[in-house]
Amino acid sequence: MVYLPFLLIFNLISYFPSSSHAQNADLILPLKAVNLGNWLVTEGWMKPSRFDGIINKDLLDGTQVQFLSTKLKKYLCAENGGGTVVVANRPSPSGWETFRLWRVSESCFNLRVFNKQFVGLGSQGVQAVSDTPTDTETFEIVRKDDDRNRVRFKASNGLFLQAQSETLVTADYAESSWDDSDPSVFILTIVNTLQGEFQITNGYGPDKAPQVMQDHWNSYITEEDFNFMSANGLSAVRIPVGWWIAQDPTPPKPFVGGSSIALDNAFTWAEKYGMKVIIDLHAAKASQNGDEHSGARDGFLEWADSNIDETVAVIEFLAARYGVRPNLAAIALMNEPRAPGVTLDALTKYYKAAYDAIRKYTNAYVILSARLGPADPKELFSLASTMNRVAIDVHYYNLFSDSFSGMTVQQNIDFVNNQRASDLGSLTSANGPLVLVGEWTAEFARNDASMEDYQRFAKAQLDVYGRATFGWAYWAYNCDRNHWSLKWMIENNFIQL
């Protein structure tokens, strides 16, 4: 870490080191940026082959599963969602019949239920009452060799879980068969999966994960990429990072060290090619949105007031380490906090504290991400008005909502030209904060679009998002899905910046 002497008081509450003023003197807004997604924070959908070397790669942390008793033809269920017994009496599955895996080893798991307790052994049978998993909440999932969705559960006592009746599930079965009449046999259905940083590092385990991650960091983004980006008109990169970077080189397991060195390299390369850097805290400890890219273990959003101090500490680490870098443009405090799980009150407390932490080291811009879900980005305006050099971050995708599924190409373009332009215009005012469209892409919910269609859609977004006062950042630079990859889009003449 680098600590600089304080020089002057700014805005009554902010202190800046002397070098910080020169730092942003050459910052030209608006920025034309691209996100270096799936580099320092894993998003498996962007390059699925990264997971190919994991044994039982379909059973990673956070995989949501359901189990049908072959004998009873009923689903296992955590009665009342948890806090009591496990039964096998549901004819169809829903929330209480869905379990989230915590991976202990290649074949051993904890099963977390709807109310967040763990399935375990009890005196009256199998129950879901423990808030913390121990050996008695750990089960080996034994899969049939020629039918991987046919499973049995070996408990810590060495015996198998069985559905004796619809209301009695025990772990006392010693027989071994795969017949439908066997009460210990269940049909596994995978409902949802996560492929984030926790999943890939815990999936490979402590022996393999360090090398797997290092190889990825060294190859996925290189100096040549910064040369390419700069040569094609980009002025900045937005780099997602996870909370574990602050504990390099020995972050808590299963995360592995090395991401801070990769980020160091990015700053050096960016400076060489005349580019600025936005550091984006994409993954906060306890997860601010439950998505895989937040570093979540099992998809539960659990970030709250109790996590504010440790999240501020991550921001302070970033500001201390990179605040002296002349090409630091901004630090984004938290990516996509989701409402109502993350309350405005908690977020405001965090944003205030994180802003103050940054101002100990640098006058770089501070970016406040708008909440996802039922929240208005303008809810941050009053907070932003008390701060200096801040921007509000909004993300615009013509995806992830049923409202886009039936749109024609022209309707997608019209939506950008009309609705998105209106949304962006409402956030832009002479006295308000700057605005960053921190994520957007040229993909939409069409599988019949032509090259010209994509070109028109991309151009419409460039025209509209070009009005954002802080700038925009395309998602992403490198991706297996072509239209999500700005590098591919440029190389194949689908977009002109």
What are these regions (language model features)?
Residues 60-192:
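Lectin-like carbohydrate-binding module/patch detector with strong preference for beta-trefoil
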Residues 44-59, 253-258, 286-305, 389, ...:
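Aromatic- and acidic-residue-enriched segments that line the glycan-binding/catalytic groove
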Residues 2-22:
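Cleavable N-terminal signal peptides of Sec/SRP-targeted secreted and luminal proteins
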Residues 454, 471-497:
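Extended, alpha-helix-rich binding/interface surfaces that flank or overlap catalytic cores
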Residues 236, 240-242:
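Mobile, glycine-rich extracellular loop/lid and propeptide segments
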Residues 63, 210-211, 215-235, 252-282, ...:
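An active-site-proximal structural segment forming one wall of the substrate-binding cleft
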Residues 16-63, 158, 189-234:
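N-terminal carbohydrate-binding accessory modules
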Residues 28, 191, 287-446, 462-463, ...:
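Active-site region of glycoside hydrolase catalytic domains
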